[in-house]
Amino acid sequence: MARIAGVDLPRDKRIEIALTYVYGIGLSRAQEIIANTGVNPDTRVRDLSDEDALKLRSYVTDNYQVEGDLRRLESMNIKRLVDIGTYRGRRHRQGLPVRGQRTRTNARTRRGRRVTVAGKKKAPR
């Protein structure tokens, strides 16, 4: 099983798809990596030679921030926005949408589950 950036790639998938299991590598970046390393994109991970695996591993670590480093960078960027008190930082802290979306309705993903507020009870007649 090939390991790239601390992630075990699934053995039965094509290398092009398997690379997307690494945080920070999507399909277009995986295709770019394969083109630059000269590995056949139709190769399955189980059929990958040690030489090819080493080529992929070194190319990814030298050219991209992936996995833990990328997660740390993202969280530090958000922390910086919060610390300097920007509007975006306040929205992150409040758990609301950051990029100008409406919040009167929708925004459920960012705000979490609905909290039902009991309405006024009708007086019995």
Swiss-Prot record:
Compositionally biased region (Basic residues): 101-125
Superkingdom of origin organism: Bacteria
SUPFAM superfamilies cross-referenced by the UniProt entry: S13-like H2TH domain
Function: Located at the top of the head of the 30S subunit, it contacts several helices of the 16S rRNA. In the 70S ribosome it contacts the 23S rRNA (bridge B1a) and protein L5 of the 50S subunit (bridge B1b), connecting the 2 subunits; these bridges are implicated in subunit movement. Contacts the tRNAs in the A and P-sites.
Family, similarity comment: Belongs to the universal ribosomal protein uS13 family.
Subunit structure: Part of the 30S ribosomal subunit. Forms a loose heterodimer with protein S19. Forms two bridges to the 50S subunit in the 70S ribosome.
Protein name, UniProt field: Small ribosomal subunit protein uS13
Organism: Picosynechococcus sp. (strain ATCC 27264 / PCC 7002 / PR-6) (Agmenellum quadruplicatum)
Gene: rpsM
